[in-house]
């Protein structure tokens, strides 16, 4: 399955349309990521650090920031002394969209799977990027240290993510800038769609019922 693709001109129009909805202060202020980590973010980037932090995850964060969006990446938005689970869980519950970068060592991380499960439990839209791994290869690793309740959460979340249309990237053949650009375009499209849906819901609630 393939995601709907837009021309570059259409994407630029979508981006301008999205920014036009933001307040002037949002578009011009200098952002302190440590302060913004306490607030709602547009996009939470879920990834395995040893695989993708120095590549696709950081490039995504930088590109989304350049687009005047508010992404969340643990090493960018958190500082020494912050409580890990409190900050991560709060950011996920308050984000608008999640990007999950699946990679060969992803399923070995309790934190990665916890974040993914929280996405699904919070009913967030998740954009999967399968980096050097196929969806069919993703399996929860049970080393005996994970509580049964969490194993069930992780398996359910992983199965849902595996059957969600996403992007694929092969680091030996692909171009990082292409997958970053494509993922960013999907984020913008999704944010605009979500905003339109929210406006329709709000409008319907404010419309008086005919007698």
Residue ranges and their predicted role:
Residues 65-66, 77, 85-182:
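Cross-kingdom TIR/SEFIR domain
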Residues 2-97, 121-124, 182-211:
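Conserved N-terminal substructure of TIR/SEFIR domains
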């Amino acid at each position: 399955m393939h995601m709907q693709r837009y021309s570059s001109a259409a994407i630029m129009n979508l981006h301008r349309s999205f920014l036009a909805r933001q307040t002037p202060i949002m578009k011009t202020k200098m952002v302190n990521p440590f302060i913004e980590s306490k607030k709602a973010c547009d996009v939470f980037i879920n990834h395995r650090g040893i695989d993708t932090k120095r590549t696709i995850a950081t490039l995504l964060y930088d590109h989304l920031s350049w687009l005047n969006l508010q992404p969340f990446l643990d090493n960018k938005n958190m500082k020494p002394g912050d409580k890990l689970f409190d900050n991560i869980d709060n950011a996920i519950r308050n984000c608008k969209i999640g990007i999950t970068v699946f990679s060969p060592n992803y399923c070995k991380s309790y934190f990665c799977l916890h974040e993914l499960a929280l996405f699904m439990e919070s009913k967030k839209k998740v954009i999967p990027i399968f980096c050097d791994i196929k969806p069919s290869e993703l399996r929860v690793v049970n080393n005996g240290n994970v509580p049964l309740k969490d194993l069930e959460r992780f398996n359910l979340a992983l199965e849902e993510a595996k059957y969600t249309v996403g992007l694929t990237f092969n680091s030996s053949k692909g171009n990082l800038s292409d997958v970053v650009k494509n993922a960013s375009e999907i984020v913008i499209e999704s944010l605009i769609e979500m905003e339109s849906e929210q406006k329709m819901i709000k409008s319907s609630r404010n419309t008086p019922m005919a007698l």
